[in-house]
């Protein structure tokens, strides 16, 4: 009982600090003190990707997904990236999430590795934004996010056929053999040459069901399905695009715990246009508004440590309601929050 009371006192204090004050006219850029790469190595289990405070989306690179080393999907000591998935745990020390892995690549579509070395010196991350160059493919990847949607921008530099792998079977698991079995049910539909919708039911740390809408700003000209392995329920799709060197493809992913319609509404309300820079700026603004609620003095190093800690603290818990306030609760029930908030991932 004492432990429970202590937890709620801590949570209340955090709430008073961050939720009771509404600052306006913020001038200083507090995001410049955040280093998302802190904790990416030595089993720190943090990720460098893009998210907003307490959002459902944490879109980030994955360098591995089949051991305790990859609870957040990424270890900066690795030399290659296997794709970019839409949600991640942060600092928890348990594997889960990593839903919908997407990898842009070029050249031979039968590439069996589906991963690339990356230029660590050109990797960038700050609140609400991440970018990296996949050196094997010559593709620049940029990521940003809203509360319920992820946005990708892939710039293809090489004069080779452009492709995107959409892996609906992938996820972050404890051991590699679970990659074939953690998806226990899946449905997928190709609406047109711009859209993919569906749902997955998965079981790793807990059993979850999520619905998705994936949209491209350019039509794919061809699509292939990779041969599934024994026990797999979800599909892996290879999409080809007609691009010239230097052109890009943008991808948006909406998620919902309730329905495909909920994921679609998230895209319509939060991310209706193909304006990557606008979403990036809004995400940074959301973080700066939160971080600015506490102003501290100290050295540059001390400020980086402090504001990065606040940043990591406010990635979770995650508001899993749809735009209309509905969410999937215990026993697979659909519930409604009149304030549009219901928090999951209550791990500290």
Task: List each language-model region with its residue ranges.
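Bacterial Sec-dependent signal peptides at the C-terminal "C-region" and cleavage site
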Residues: 18-28
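Bacterial N-terminal signal peptides
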Residues: 9-18
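Bacterial N-terminal signal peptides that target proteins for export
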Residues: 1-10
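Accessory carbohydrate-recognition regions in carbohydrate-active enzymes
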Residues: 26-348
């Amino acid at each position: 009982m004492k432990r429970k009371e202590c937890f709620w006192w801590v949570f209340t204090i955090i709430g008073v600090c961050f939720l009771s004050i509404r600052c306006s006219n913020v001038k200083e850029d507090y995001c410049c003190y955040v280093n998302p790469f802190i904790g990416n190595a030595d089993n720190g289990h943090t990720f460098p990707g893009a998210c907003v405070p307490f959002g459902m989306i944490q879109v980030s690179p994955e360098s591995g997904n089949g051991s305790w080393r990859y609870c957040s999907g990424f270890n900066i000591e690795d030399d290659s990236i296997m794709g970019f998935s839409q949600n991640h745990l942060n600092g928890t020390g348990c594997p889960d999430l990593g839903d919908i892995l997407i990898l842009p690549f070029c050249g031979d579509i039968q590439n069996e590795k589906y991963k690339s070395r990356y230029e660590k010196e050109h990797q960038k991350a700050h609140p609400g934004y991440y970018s990296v160059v996949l050196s094997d493919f010559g593709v620049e990847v940029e990521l940003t996010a809203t509360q319920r949607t992820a946005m990708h921008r892939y710039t293809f530099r090489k004069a080779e056929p452009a492709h995107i792998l959409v892996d609906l079977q992938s996820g972050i698991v404890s051991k590699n053999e679970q990659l074939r079995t953690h998806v226990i049910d899946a449905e997928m539909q190709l609406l047109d040459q711009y859209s993919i919708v569906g749902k997955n039911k998965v079981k790793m740390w807990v059993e979850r069901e999520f619905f998705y809408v994936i949209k491209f700003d350019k039509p794919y000209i061809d699509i292939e399905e990779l041969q599934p392995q024994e026990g797999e329920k979800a599909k892996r799709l290879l999409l080809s695009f007609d691009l010239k060197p230097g052109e890009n493809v943008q991808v948006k992913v909406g998620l919902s715990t309730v329905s495909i319609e909920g994921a679609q509404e998230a895209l319509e309300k939060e991310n209706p246009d193909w304006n990557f820079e606008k979403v990036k700026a809004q995400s940074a603004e959301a973080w700066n508004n939160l971080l600015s609620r506490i102003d501290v003095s100290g050295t540059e190093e001390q400020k980086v440590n402090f504001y990065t800690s606040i940043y990591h603290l406010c990635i979770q818990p995650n508001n899993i309601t749809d735009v209309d306030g509905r969410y999937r609760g215990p026993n697979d029930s659909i519930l409604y929050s009149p304030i549009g908030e219901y928090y999951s991932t209550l791990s500290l």
